[in-house]
């Protein structure tokens, strides 16, 4: 076990939480990071939890972790005029996550929405948010814009 280890705080969107749980690494992530979410993510998780498939099962498990206070739910208070617009590729949940990052000065947003990535990066750069952490649901590789990982890459698989 690590001693004197301070967890890094991150904000995660709905699909990344579901992907991490479906991949079996959400609880490990919670051991390493303090995960916060805006209230809209809880609403989206409840919607997904209604499905009788792997995503629904994962959403129900994430909701249980929220009830156990292993994931913090935060109210988003400050929304600037620019951020209040929901872009075509960025949904309300992702925009709320970006707003929470800005409001609480949390430097890392965890998402797996590759379609929204260009707009998320643009918005984060406009608002001087330096880090977006992208979880690739198709593999265990992860890509970060402006962020060094806390662990070293595997010797035969350098980070891109």
Give the residues covered by each predicted segment:
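Active-site-proximal, substrate-binding regions of enzyme catalytic domains
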Residues: 2-107, 114-160
């Amino acid at each position: 076990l690590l001693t004197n280890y301070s967890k890094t705080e991150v904000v995660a969107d709905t699909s990344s939480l579901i992907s991490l749980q479906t991949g079996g690494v959400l609880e490990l992530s919670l051991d390493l990071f303090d995960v916060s979410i805006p209230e809209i993510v809880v609403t989206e998780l409840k919607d997904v939890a209604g499905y009788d498939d792997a995503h629904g099962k994962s959403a129900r498990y994430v909701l249980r972790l929220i009830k156990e206070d292993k994931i913090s739910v935060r109210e988003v208070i400050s929304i600037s005029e620019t951020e209040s617009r929901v872009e075509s590729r960025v949904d309300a949940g992702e925009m709320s996550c970006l707003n929470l990052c800005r409001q609480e000065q949390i430097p890392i947003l965890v998402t797996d929405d590759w379609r929204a990535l260009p707009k998320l990066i643009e918005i984060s750069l406009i608002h001087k948010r330096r880090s977006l952490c992208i979880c690739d649901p198709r593999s265990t590789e992860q890509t970060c814009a402006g962020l060094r990982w806390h662990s070293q890459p595997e010797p035969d698989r350098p980070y891109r």
